[in-house]
Structure formats: C-alpha cells, structure tokens
C-alpha cells in the first residue's frame, strides 16, 4: 500500500498532511450477468501494520479485515431487505490500537456477514474513559440504483467518567458520570434519527438529553439538535468550577430545540429558574452580579464604584432567579421571568435586605458575535480590578 500512497504525496499533497502507511491489501471480484441476474460479489482482505496521519494526530496499528460483499444490481426495493439468515458470507474485523487526541482503543474485534446489498456487524463492546460503550447488531443497506447507504443499530454507554474526558479547559473542571441509552439509531443520507436519552450526573444534579437528531449527517452543513432538561443543579457546586462568581441555590430549567451547525449553536430556547430548598441558602456574590449584568447589558453592575463595605459581603440574598434566553437567526435575546410593577427582574431580592438584578433593556436584541464577546468578558472584571489596584 505504501508505494501507492507515495504517488499521492508526489502529486502535490500539502506537506505534513500525507498519510504514512504500511500494509497489504488484496481482493477478489466475481461478476455475473444474465437475463435474470446482475451481481458483483467478492472479498477484500486488508492487513495494515501501521497507519499514521500527522496532521490529524491519528495513529492506527494492527488493522486486519476480511470483508465479503455481494451487490445485487437488479434487486428492487420491493424485494425487501434480507434477514440475518440470508447473509451467507462471513468475515472479521480486528484492530490492535487506535489513538487520536481524543480517544484511544485497544484490542477491538468484530464479526461481520454479508448478503445481497447488506452488511451486518455483530455486537461490539469498548471501554471508554472508565465506562462501557456497547453497540448492538449493526446493519447497513446499499441501494443498488442510487448507491445510497442506510443503516440501523443501537448504542448504550454506562458510567463514563467525565473527569477523564480530554475537553477540560483551564477554567472549568467537569466531574461526574454520564450514560446514554439509544435502543434505536436509524441512518440515511438525509438524517440520523436517534431514539432514547442520555444523562449527565453533574454539580449535584442531573442534566437529561433527549430528542437527538442529525440532519444531513454526511454533509459539512450537518445540523445536530437535541433537547435538554436541567434538574436540581447545585449552583454552589457549579460556580465553584466556572469563573463566574459564587452563586448558591438550586436550579431547574430546560433548553429546547438546541441546534448546532458548523460547530456553533444555531438556535435554542432556554429557561432556568431557582427552586427553594430547605437548608440551602440563595445568595449572589458581587462578582456574580457583575457578570450576570455583563451578559444582560454588556456593562458591569458595580463598574468599580460599589461602596467598600460591599466588597466584604460574601453573598447577597435573593428570593428568585429566573432567566429566559433565545437564539434565532444569529440574534440573541435575554430576559427575566420575574415581572413586578412594570419592572423585569433576572434576580429578585427578598422583602428586606438582598440584591436585585434588573433587565433595563428587555426588548434589546444582540448578535451572536456580541453575546460571545460578553461571555468572554465574564470573569474578567475581578482580574481587571486587581490589576488596576496593583
């Protein structure tokens, strides 16, 4: 295989993007055509000692595959899809090691079978960040006329350790467990449909994920959508891990029609509210008030002019927190759910001492870029104050 890859390199592939590969491939193809049948069948054997993509930081070692195939070019859709008993050709797939910046697998093996216009893989289990990832029986179908690929499978993930994920930033430390249960996954050129749900046990509460779907999964313009339910998140545990400022209390909420395209959020409807719980205080630090005000208006609440005594108060009490936010057509809105006396509140104080955060521009809409700028400024107010004081 390596000599063939060298031709690609010499043909002008960008330096550093070339595949480095060593191994062998062989195959057999049988073609049968008569008045009743047009069939292409055969078998491909692949043995790769090592494949390396420096640009993607991907390394693959010890790949061995024996893949049979049968393409019945005259089989009509109405003839139906063959059952497992109609898959006469057996094969195998094994992988010694796969390593990427995000994942690493060792010792993967799977049996497969082929029938007319169909492949089927036996169930497969992988260890992933302390959890167990299971794929059920996977079937792939090929349309002989248009060449479209469809398929179905199932997937289950138990007890994945979020602390082990390679997505941690220097500002956020994510701990907890995750699990997914997708009893039915349907794949087509236009849509990846997923039935089931997932959950993340984080920050003393639960984040539930449901209604997953991927539109145009093979396109760069693919759209990923899901719904999210936020159940009893401990705000103290959450704000201990993000540079927002301390907030205490219990939070519930939902995110509907959360949609991503080209790696960025495209639309959502978010609503979160505090839930009183006996023995759990409800407080906002001054830094948290500043950062919430930055998100809602673009300006700090204290602006460096707050009385000196306020800087020594650990937390200001609040009676209720309620926020609604939407993203549509590159436009953000941010509003409070609490409206009293013609005033819209993001945070409402108790009857006596406490803190209010008022939305003074409830009808204002801002661009996605401006909201990203505000989010990037969150947590910087305290740093800026310290540098000025020094």
Set out the residue ranges of the language-model regions.
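Extended amphipathic, helix-rich lipid-handling scaffolds
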Residues: 1-58, 63-189, 193, 212-260, ...
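Short conserved micro-motifs at the rims of enzyme active sites and ligand-binding pockets
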Residues: 165-167, 238-241, 282-286, 334-338, ...
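A cross-taxonomic marker for long C-terminal extensions/tails that follow the last structured domain
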Residues: 316-352
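C-terminal structural cap/anchor segments
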Residues: 254-261, 265-277
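Short edge-strand/loop segments of extracellular domains
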Residues: 202-205, 273-280
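Outer-membrane beta-barrel pore domains and translocons
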Residues: 45-47, 156, 199-201, 273, ...
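Outer-membrane beta-barrel and related beta-rich outer-membrane complex signature
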Residues: 56, 280-291
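Flexible glycine-/small-residue-rich
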Residues: 230, 274, 336
């Amino acid at each position: 295989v390596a000599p063939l890859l060298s031709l690609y390199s010499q043909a002008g592939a960008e330096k550093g993007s070339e595949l480095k590969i060593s191994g062998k491939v062989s195959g057999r193809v049988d073609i049968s055509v008569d008045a009743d049948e047009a069939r292409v069948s055969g078998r491909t054997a692949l043995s790769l000692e090592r494949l390396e993509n420096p640009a993607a930081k991907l390394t693959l070692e010890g790949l061995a595959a024996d893949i049979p195939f049968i393409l019945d070019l005259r089989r009509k859709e109405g003839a139906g899809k063959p059952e497992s008993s109609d898959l006469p050709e057996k094969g195998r797939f094994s992988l010694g090691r796969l390593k990427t910046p995000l994942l690493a697998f060792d010792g993967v093996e799977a049996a497969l079978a082929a029938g007319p216009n169909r492949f089927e893989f036996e169930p497969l289990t992988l260890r992933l960040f302390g959890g167990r990832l299971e794929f059920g029986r996977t079937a792939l179908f090929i349309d002989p006329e248009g060449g479209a690929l469809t398929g179905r499978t199932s997937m289950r993930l138990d007890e994945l350790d979020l602390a082990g994920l390679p997505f941690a930033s220097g500002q956020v430390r994510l701990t907890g467990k995750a699990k997914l249960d997708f009893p039915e996954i349907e794949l087509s050129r236009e849509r990846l449909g997923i039935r089931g749900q997932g959950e993340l046990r984080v920050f003393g509460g639960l984040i539930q994920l449901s209604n997953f779907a991927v539109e145009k999964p093979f396109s760069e313009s693919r759209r990923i959508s899901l719904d999210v339910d936020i159940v009893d998140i401990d705000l103290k545990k959450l704000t201990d891990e993000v540079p927002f400022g301390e907030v205490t209390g219990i939070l519930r909420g939902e995110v509907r029609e959360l949609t991503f395209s080209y790696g960025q959020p495209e639309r959502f409807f978010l609503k979160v509210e505090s839930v009183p719980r006996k023995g759990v205080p409800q407080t906002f630090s001054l830094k948290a008030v500043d950062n919430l005000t930055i998100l809602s208006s673009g300006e700090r609440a204290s602006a460096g002019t707050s009385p000196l005594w306020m800087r020594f108060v650990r937390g200001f009490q609040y009676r209720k927190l309620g926020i609604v936010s939407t993203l549509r057509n590159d436009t953000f809105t941010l509003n409070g759910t609490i409206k009293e006396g013609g005033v819209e509140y993001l945070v409402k104080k108790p009857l006596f001492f406490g803190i209010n955060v008022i939305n003074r521009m409830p009808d204002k809409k801002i661009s996605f870029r401006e909201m990203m700028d505000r989010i990037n400024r969150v947590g910087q107010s305290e740093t800026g104050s310290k540098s000025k004081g020094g």
